[in-house]
């Protein structure tokens, strides 16, 4: 993983996307369980 010049490493993109998806799913379920799912 030394040749990361000019491009973003693929594992950073995968990690960021995974965290984003997990965060969105968590917020969605938290909002629906809290009664705020209808406002989203």
From Swiss-Prot:
It comes from the Eukaryota. It is found in: Plastid, Chloroplast thylakoid membrane. It holds the Pfam family PsbJ. Keywords: Chloroplast, Membrane, Photosynthesis, Photosystem II, Plastid, Reaction center, Thylakoid, Transmembrane, Transmembrane helix. NCBIfam families: PRK02565.1. Belongs to the PsbJ family. One of the components of the core complex of photosystem II (PSII). PSII is a light-driven water:plastoquinone oxidoreductase that uses light energy to abstract electrons from H(2)O, generating O(2) and a proton gradient subsequently used for ATP formation. It consists of a core antenna complex that captures photons, and an electron transfer chain that converts photonic excitation into a charge separation. This is Photosystem II reaction center protein J. It comes from Aethionema grandiflorum. The lineage of its organism: Eukaryota, Viridiplantae, Streptophyta, Embryophyta, Tracheophyta.
